[in-house]
């Protein structure tokens, strides 16, 4: 044994111990560093690698009619997404083959037929990288179940579902512009969905899901994995009750469809309102759309013309001007008015609609037969200041404030800028622009005894816990006329239907009050568009104790275009169905004509009818044209329409020239141009 060998051994042992202490100390320090100093950071790193956080929303609130019948509802449904980073090629374990399985290609080929898309497009998504790509959102339950089965049967990685809310509009096109629609992120984009988005939008909660290194989901706290069915959850939701009556809305929608088919109008609007409360019972606009598939329709069809279209009202404005004259004491129903068929104001000549005069008649006859000359005389006596002041009192010139987006306020002159012709034309409903809702609201003030009401369409809003957070109620904005003036105008408007130009609105057994209107349409660049008209009718029933007030407006109907021809019959047919459906019994009413006795176009019975020329059907099917000279526009339309001939009119008054000329033989659907003066 070498000297000092023991000491060498002892030194080596000491050195080894020191090394062990250093190593253990290093490990302990590293553990302390990782477990204490870096603990939070490592936890977050682990969480980010093995979990993903997503937001789950509750279903959107319901929209129902006044009786609780659902119009817009939501259910929770599956939305499919991919995590391309987790879709790695792998060994084909299912078939026990020692080959690599192309997960991306297989997934694309299997899913494409169900998702109704191109497999190559899906493959491009799967190979594009990233951690989250939507494949299809808010799938139908049956479709989602098919995809779940494919994922489970083929053990596909990186494909998962999230629950999202899907909106259904149960009435399809009914009240489409009122309800509006939502986008893919559950955000209201139009109508009440937009206006009440804060109320209807569901709440959101963040959830996590756990997956393994290859993307297979281990635990779905919010996400439904392929082994579980996607089931809609029953949740307490906010509910918006509308003033709409679904039965009335259905009748109105059908009437509008029929009107558009018959008249080929460019657009239309109709509103039914409770004249004593301001509740909107029905509202329809054309063209329309199905909010379940709003993207398939033109944005023009999303517009609610009942509140957003402004137009010159024409003769339906005359009862408003008449109330001004009655209130100011300028006229009474019996005040004699001289009607010569035409009246000159400054450098402008204004004619009656048919160019004829009736001599001296009471003011009630001016309203009954819509005599322009009589209304112009009243307008000139009222003057610009009073015309505009009263128009504002009746609610024109400012939005009504209904709970719908996109409402227009109309257009009124500044009285300081009005010349005499402006005053004269405003008295007959020109030079003033209104919306259908504004016009109906003003007429309701006549129907209810003088109260200008705040129209409303939300009956109440009930929170998820049952608390009523808003409740609609009758609101009187102001009293615009006295009960006496309202009664006098109601009586005059009743004679419009029973004896005057609005006979086509009469419903046998019921007292109807109303007014027709036919106005030239404003051209985009100023002035009036040749041959384009707005045809309207506004009225209420029963005339003495109104239950329903209704306005019908047709934009540019083809062929017949007078309000008495196209709009009044819609009023009649719609309200007749509603009165029967609601059990409102007819009352004895002397003087109401039967349908057989009605003059089809509301001609003036007091006027001597001219002998009209005759069109001849030739053996070869062509139609021989007569000479239209001396006829008014209405008679010309009545002659052409049965032979399917179209009128393109120029000017107003009586015919003096035509093309093709008299004696020409033309085919059906030919357009006949006639110049009136």
Where are these regions (language model features)?
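Soluble non-cytosolic domains of exported or imported proteins
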Residues: 58, 98-105, 137-142, 186-190, ...
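Small/polar-residue-rich segments within soluble enzyme cores
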Residues: 101, 106-113, 124-236, 552
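Ligand-recognition elements built from short beta-strands and adjacent flexible loops
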Residues: 509, 523, 552-556, 562-568, ...
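Short, small/polar residue-rich loop motifs at catalytic or cofactor-binding pockets
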Residues: 55-59, 264-267, 455, 649, ...
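Beta-lactam-recognizing serine transpeptidase/beta-lactamase-like catalytic domain environment
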Residues: 72, 215-231, 270, 275-315, ...
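Hydrophobic alpha-helical transmembrane signal-anchor segments
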Residues: 8-41
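Conserved, well-ordered alpha-helix/loop/beta-strand core segments that scaffold catalytic motifs
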Residues: 223-268
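Juxtamembrane extramembrane loops of integral membrane proteins
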Residues: 54, 58-116
């Amino acid at each position: 044994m070498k000297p000092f060998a023991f000491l060498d051994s002892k030194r080596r042992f000491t050195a080894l111990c020191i090394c062990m202490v250093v190593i253990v100390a290093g490990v302990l320090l590293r553990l302390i560093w990782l477990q204490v100093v870096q603990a939070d950071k490592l936890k977050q790193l682990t969480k980010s690698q093995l979990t993903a956080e997503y937001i789950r929303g509750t279903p959107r609130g319901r929209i129902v009619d006044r009786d609780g019948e659902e119009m817009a509802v939501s259910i929770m449904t599956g939305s499919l997404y991919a995590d391309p980073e987790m879709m790695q090629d792998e060994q084909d374990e299912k078939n026990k083959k020692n080959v690599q399985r192309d997960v991306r290609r297989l997934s694309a080929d299997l899913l494409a037929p169900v998702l109704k898309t191109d497999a190559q497009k899906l493959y491009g998504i799967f190979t594009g990288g990233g951690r989250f790509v939507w494949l299809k959102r808010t799938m139908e339950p049956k479709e989602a179940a098919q995809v779940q089965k494919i994922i489970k049967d083929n053990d596909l990685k990186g494909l998962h579902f999230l629950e999202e809310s899907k909106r259904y509009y149960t009435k399809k096109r009914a009240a489409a512009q009122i309800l509006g629609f939502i986008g893919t992120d559950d955000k209201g984009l139009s109508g009440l969905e937009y206006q009440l988005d804060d109320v209807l939008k569901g709440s959101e909660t963040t959830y996590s899901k756990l997956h393994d290194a290859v993307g297979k989901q281990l635990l779905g706290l919010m996400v439904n994995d392929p082994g579980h069915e996607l089931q809609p959850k029953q949740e307490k939701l906010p509910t918006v009750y509308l003033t709409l009556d679904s039965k009335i809305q259905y009748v109105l929608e059908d009437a509008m469809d029929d009107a558009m088919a018959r008249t080929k109008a460019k657009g239309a609007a109709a509103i039914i309102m409770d004249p004593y409360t301001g509740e909107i019972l029905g509202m329809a606009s054309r063209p329309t759309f199905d909010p379940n598939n709003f993207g398939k329709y033109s944005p023009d069809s999303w517009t609610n013309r009942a509140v957003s279209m402004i137009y010159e009202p024409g003769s339906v404005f005359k009862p408003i001007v008449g109330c001004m004259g009655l209130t100011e004491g300028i006229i009474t129903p019996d005040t004699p008015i001289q009607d010569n068929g035409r009246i000159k104001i400054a450098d402008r000549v204004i004619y009656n609609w048919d160019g004829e005069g009736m001599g001296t008649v009471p003011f009630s006859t001016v309203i009954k037969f819509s005599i322009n000359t009589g209304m112009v005389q009243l307008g000139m006596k009222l003057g610009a200041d009073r015309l505009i002041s009263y128009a504002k009192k009746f609610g024109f010139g400012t939005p009504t404030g209904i709970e719908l987006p996109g409402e227009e306020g109309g257009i009124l002159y500044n009285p300081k800028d009005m010349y005499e012709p402006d005053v004269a034309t405003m008295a007959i409903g020109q030079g003033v622009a209104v919306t259908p809702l504004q016009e109906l609201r003003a007429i309701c003030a006549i129907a209810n005894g003088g109260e200008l009401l705040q129209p409303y369409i939300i009956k109440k809003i009930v929170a998820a816990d049952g608390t009523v957070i808003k409740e609609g109620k009758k609101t009187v904005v102001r009293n615009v006329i006295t009960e006496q003036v309202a009664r006098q105008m109601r009586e005059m408007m009743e004679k419009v239907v029973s004896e005057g130009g609005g006979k086509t609105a009469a419903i046998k057994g019921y007292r109807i009050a109303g007014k027709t209107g036919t106005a030239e349409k404003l051209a985009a660049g100023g002035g009036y568009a040749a041959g384009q008209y707005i045809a309207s009718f506004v009225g209420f029933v029963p005339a003495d104790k109104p239950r329903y007030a209704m306005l019908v407006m047709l934009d540019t109907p083809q062929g017949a275009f007078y309000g008495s021809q196209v709009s009044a019959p819609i009023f009649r047919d719609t309200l007749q169905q509603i009165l029967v459906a609601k059990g409102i019994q007819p009352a004895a009413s002397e003087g109401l004509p039967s349908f057989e006795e009605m003059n089809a176009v509301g001609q003036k019975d007091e006027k001597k009818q001219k002998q009209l020329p005759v069109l001849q059907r030739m053996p070869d099917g062509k139609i021989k044209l007569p000479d239209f000279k001396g006829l008014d526009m209405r008679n010309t339309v009545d002659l052409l329409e049965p032979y399917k001939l179209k009128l393109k009119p120029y000017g107003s008054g009586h015919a003096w020239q035509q093309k093709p000329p008299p004696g020409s033989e033309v085919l059906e659907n030919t357009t006949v141009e006639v110049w009136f003066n």
